[in-house]
Regions:
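Hydrophobic, glycine/alanine-rich multi-pass transmembrane helices and their short helix-loop junctions
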Residues: 50, 148-201
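Structured non-transmembrane domains adjacent to transmembrane bundles in polytopic membrane proteins
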Residues: 1-89
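Membrane-water interface of transmembrane alpha-helices in multipass transporters/channels
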Residues: 57-66, 86-107, 167-181
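Helix-loop junctions and hydrophobic alpha-helical segments within the transmembrane domains
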Residues: 130-152
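Alpha-helical transmembrane segments of integral membrane proteins
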Residues: 40-51, 67, 71, 104-111, ...
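Alpha-helical transmembrane segments of multi-pass inner-membrane proteins
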Residues: 38, 42, 63, 100, ...
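Short helical (or helix-break) motifs at transmembrane helix termini and adjacent helical loops
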Residues: 109-129, 151
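Conserved small/polar residues in nucleotide/adenosyl-binding loops
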Residues: 202-208
Length: 214
């Protein structure tokens, strides 16, 4: 309707503006749709370049980005099921409705940053172990052991903080808190503890060179 009204008044001699919260959301959605590909490309490329400077490997930065995206997409899926489909609407005391247009960009930025923080911490420990042993399997095991407690503790703190927002009355705050808690939980318990070590061992021939460069 808003697009129809704007199209109908476009040829008018007078400047006619269409207001209201709905028109704001329409404009914001179009603006985000135009900018998101550029922002995503910038974030992913810069992330891979910085990780490459750390480990001097082509495979490891790509793996790092993919693992982070895995955590973020898991939270995206659950937030849709819970808040749009209403899976936990009674338990969390809210009425199911479409997600606010600002939720996905905010969620991606925060969750991706936290995931990369844990990734860099783990890669640093693995890299240090490789320099001492030059054994990829042992380096992954020792790196996971050295960083595991720190990552788990940091994740537990963040989950506790984000979970507090779930009890908010404002739906956008509730949904962001839930999604971030899920993203951190998935990242710390599944991605960092299982998927990342498995990928490093599976791609050991390609990653081995990078993990051992000064």
């Amino acid at each position: 309707l808003i697009k129809d009204v704007r199209g109908f008044t476009r040829d008018s001699d007078q400047e006619i503006l269409v207001g209201s919260w709905t028109s704001y959301e329409v404009d914001m959605k179009e603006h985000l749709s135009e900018r998101i590909p550029t922002v995503l490309s910038f974030v992913l490329i810069v992330t891979m370049v910085l990780v490459w400077f750390q480990v001097k490997s082509v495979v490891v930065p790509i793996k790092a980005v993919l693992m982070n995206i895995l955590s973020v997409t898991a939270s995206f899926g659950l937030i849709v099921v819970v808040f749009q489909e209403g899976l936990l609407s009674d338990a969390l005391n809210f009425t199911p409705q479409p997600l606010d247009v600002m939720v996905p960009p905010l969620l991606f930025g925060i969750a991706f940053g936290l995931s990369m923080d844990y990734e860099v911490l783990m890669l640093s420990r693995i890299h240090e172990s490789w320099l001492e042993t030059e054994d990829n399997t042992r380096a992954v095991a020792e790196g996971l052991q050295a960083s595991g407690r720190l990552i788990t503790g940091a994740a537990a703190i963040m989950i506790a903080v984000f979970s507090g927002f779930i009890f908010a009355d404002v739906l956008i705050i509730k949904s962001i808190g839930f999604a971030l808690a899920v993203a951190v939980f998935v990242d710390a318990t599944i991605v960092r503890a299982i998927v990342v070590p498995s990928c490093l061992l599976y791609t050991s021939d390609a990653a081995d060179e990078g993990l051992g460069v000064d």
